[in-house]
Amino acid sequence: MTAAAPSQQRPAAARARNLPWVEKYRPQTLADLISHQDILSTIQKFISEDRLPHLLLYGPPGTGKTSTILACAKQLYKDKEFGSMVLELNASDDRGIDIVRGPILSFASTRTIFKKGFKLVILDEADAMTQDAQNALRRVIEKFTENTRFCLICNYLSKIIPALQSRCTRFRFGPLTPELMVPRLEHVVQEENVDISEDGMKALVTLSSGDMRRALNILQSTNMAFGKVTEETVYTCTGHPLKTDIANILDWMLNQDFTTAYKNIMELKTLKGLALHDILTEVHLFVHRVDFPSSVRIHLLTKMADIEYRLSVGTSEKIQLSSLIAAFQVTRDLIVAEA
């Protein structure tokens, strides 16, 4: 028995080592979660008083919605009963009414013999469900409230029908602040012995925009690809344009003739694999920072909005890049005319 123990431990250690960091460092208890303390304290009170209602957790990706309800489930149920008491589904896998009539209905309608209390159905990405499926789910929730609690998780509250919203207690999870993200990222960096610079950490936080899942994925990918996490390697790994690239692009659009600007930007896009949508996002931030005359800023933002829309419906990047350069060159002429 003692000789076999190390060989039994090795597969478990290997599994932990091969796990994505998002799962490896997922909070296991409510106390491990780093934000939304007001929401967590309310849910903790529901659990301690055995009055957990149906829940609707909504907000941007990577803000702790799924981690929160999984931590609740682990507090409510022991490991051996978890599988029989908790049903976790991703509604985007099967968005139709069959998922409600099939696994959800059969799980909610059966009672457990040896365990008192309610079962828990966790429905992730519930905003992907069709309206018919949501209406069917409403009837299931009404019928089996006595022995089952439902937790719906979504990014967009507006895509959940009012009848479902009214049957749940709603909690909004906002994006995480840098002050909350940095200590948790530093913990992962220390545990994984990651070589990271200060500007690399800032780039991680900036690009993730309050999404902890995205921050951890970028951190792991950059570390594996380059062995060192700096601002440049983070931007290169994600295919996002560097600040110096944006500065060059803006300089070309405002100061060079059309042909030269187009040639230089196309060469840079090809060399670094940049997407025009990412360039447009960074240039948009620049427009708000610079003190343009109001009429000039309005003209430029309107043109950029049109370009973004046309990109979203699948038009040619080359044509839209031409349109972006033209918009900036017209802007340059307007500034000169108003001077």
UniProtKB/Swiss-Prot annotation:
GO terms for molecular function: ATP binding; ATP hydrolysis activity; DNA binding; DNA clamp loader activity; enzyme binding; single-stranded DNA helicase activity. InterPro entries: AAA+_ATPase, ATPase_AAA_core, DNA_pol3_clamp-load_cplx_C, DNA_Rep/Repair_Clamp_Loader, P-loop_NTPase, Rep_factorC_C, RFC_lid. ATP binds at residues 59-66. GO terms for biological process: DNA-templated DNA replication; positive regulation of DNA-directed DNA polymerase activity. It is found in: Nucleus. GO terms for cellular component: Ctf18 RFC-like complex; DNA replication factor C complex. SUPFAM superfamilies: P-loop containing nucleoside triphosphate hydrolases (SSF52540), post-AAA+ oligomerization domain-like (SSF48019). Keywords: ATP-binding, DNA replication, Nucleotide-binding, Nucleus. Its main location: nucleus. Subunit of the RFC complex, an heteropentameric complex consisting of a large subunit RFC1 and four small subunits RFC2, RFC3, RFC4 and RFC5; the RFC complex interacts with PCNA. Forms an heterotetrameric complex with RFC2, RFC3 and RFC4; this complex has ATPase activity but is not stimulated by PCNA. The heterotetramer of subunits RFC2, RFC3, RFC4 and RFC5 interacts with RAD17. Belongs to the activator 1 small subunits family. Subunit of the replication factor C (RFC) complex which acts during elongation of primed DNA templates by DNA polymerases delta and epsilon, and is necessary for ATP-dependent loading of proliferating cell nuclear antigen (PCNA) onto primed DNA. This is Replication factor C subunit 5. It comes from Mus musculus. The gene is Rfc5.
